[in-house]
């Protein structure tokens, strides 16, 4: 009997197995991973990504930007982490007041000469105080105001001024003695700071009548 590993005429030659061929896919996968990693490293160099820094402005080209923030600021604006201010719905401000009864002199009106209104038609934001008939600006911005103060069966000339923080800004007159009803009317755009106050003041004459004809209105055109 020949010894193990021995043939009839000499030692047997061992043939190499085919296990080495099974390693080729693993070697190929490793090479592919290395190539992909290299491409990822080279990508920023060939295709730079624009990022914001302290000096570069944000450039939006044909894209919509949606900013959400659950903590709006006190003036109704929402400021994102990118420093972009977005006005919320609470930034809407408008009022319009009228009278439901005739203008009658009172101790308060004789002392302050303020023209009072007793009915609010619109008061978005509740920044017009009916008791004092004073509007208080909730934020800095450009505001529009208009007024129509009617005198009825009164031959005296009246002068009505729109007051900002106690100082007259514009005035209107009604003094035609040949008509029974006449209105002192005017309008203006004002730059107002937060908590600035606006009201109407009778600078001259007396107010009698004017039931439901006198109005005072204003609204925020845009905030600053």
Swiss-Prot record:
Glycan-bearing residues: 53, 110
Q: According to the record, what happens upon gene knockout?
A: Mice show impaired synaptic transmission within 3 weeks in interpeduncular target neurons whereas significant decrease in both the synapse density and size seen only after 3 months. Display impaired passive avoidance learning, spatial learning and short-term memory. Double CBLN1 and CBLN2 knockout mice exhibit gait abnormalities, impairments in balance and coordination and develop seizures. Synapse density in the hippocampus is normal in 1-2 months old mice, but severely decreased in 6 month old mice.
Q: Which organs or tissues contain this protein? A: Expressed in various brain regions with higher levels in the olfactory bulb, cerebral cortex, certain thalamic and hypothalamic nuclei, superior and inferior colliculi and some brainstem nuclei. Highly expressed in the dorsal medial habenula.
Under InterPro entries, the record lists: C1q_dom, Cerebellin_Synaptic_Org, Tumour_necrosis_fac-like_dom
The UniProt entry's GO CC annotations, sorted and at most eight, read: extracellular space; glutamatergic synapse; synaptic cleft; trans-synaptic protein complex
Q: Which residues cross the membrane?
A: none
- Impact reported for residue 110 to Q: No effect on its ability to form homohexameric or heteromeric complexes with other CBLN family members. Increased interaction with NRXN1. Total loss of N-glycosylation
Signal peptide range: 1-51
Whether Glycoprotein counts among this entry's keywords is yes
Q: Identify the main location.
A: secreted
Query: Which Pfam families has this protein been placed in?
Result: C1q
The UniProt keywords, alphabetically, are: Disulfide bond, Glycoprotein, Secreted, Signal
The places in or outside the cell where this protein is found are: Secreted
Q: Where is the C1q domain?
A: 88-224
Q: Which GO terms describe its biological process?
A: maintenance of synapse structure; positive regulation of synapse assembly; spontaneous synaptic transmission; synapse assembly; synapse organization; trans-synaptic signaling, modulating synaptic transmission
Instruction: List the SMART domains.
Output: C1Q (SM00110)
Q: What does this protein do?
A: Acts as a synaptic organizer in specific subsets of neurons in the brain. Essential for long-term maintenance but not establishment of excitatory synapses. Functions as part of a trans-synaptic complex by binding to postsynaptic GRID1 and presynaptic neurexins. This interaction helps regulate the activity of NMDA and AMPA receptors at hippocampal synapses without affecting synapse formation. NRXN1B-CBLN2-GRID1 complex transduce presynaptic signals into postsynaptic NMDAR response. NRXN3B-CBLN2-GRID1 complex transduce presynaptic signals into postsynaptic AMPAR response.
Q: How does it associate, per the subunit comment?
A: Homohexamer; disulfide-linked homotrimers. The trimers are assembled via the globular C1q domains. The trimers associate via N-terminal cysteine residues to form disulfide-linked hexamers. May form homooligomers or heterooligomers with CBLN1 and CBLN3 prior to secretion. Once secreted, does not interact with other CBLN family members. Interacts with GRID2, and more weakly with GRID1. Interacts with NRXN1 and NRXN2 long and short isoforms produced by alternative promoter usage. Weakly interacts with NRXN3 short isoform and not at all with NRXN3 long isoform.
Instruction: Specify the protein name.
Output: Cerebellin-2
**What organism, scientifically named, is this protein from?**
Mus musculus
Question: Gene name, please?
Answer: Cbln2
């Amino acid at each position: 009997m020949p010894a193990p590993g021995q043939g009839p005429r000499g030692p047997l030659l061992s043939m190499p197995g085919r296990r080495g061929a099974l390693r080729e896919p693993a070697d190929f996968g490793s090479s592919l991973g290395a190539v992909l990693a290299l491409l990822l490293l080279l990508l920023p160099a060939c295709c730079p990504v624009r990022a914001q820094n302290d000096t570069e402005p944000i450039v939006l080209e044909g894209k919509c930007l949606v900013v959400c923030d659950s903590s709006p600021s006190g003036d109704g604006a929402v400021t994102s982490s990118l420093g972009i201010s977005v006005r919320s719905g609470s930034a809407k401000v408008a009022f319009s007041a009228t009278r439901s009864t005739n203008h009658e002199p009172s101790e308060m009106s004789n002392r302050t000469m303020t023209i009072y209104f007793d009915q609010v038609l619109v008061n978005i934001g509740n920044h017009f105080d009916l008791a004092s008939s004073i509007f208080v600006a909730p934020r800095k911005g450009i505001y529009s105001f208009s007024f129509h103060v009617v005198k009825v069966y009164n031959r005296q000339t009246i002068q009505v001024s729109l007051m900002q923080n106690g100082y007259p800004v514009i005035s209107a007159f009604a003094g035609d003695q040949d008509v029974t009803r006449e209105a002192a009317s005017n309008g203006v755009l004002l730059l107002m700071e937060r908590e600035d106050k606006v009201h109407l003041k009778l600078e001259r004459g007396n107010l009698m009548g004017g039931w439901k004809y006198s109005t005072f209105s204003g609204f925020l055109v845009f905030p600053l």
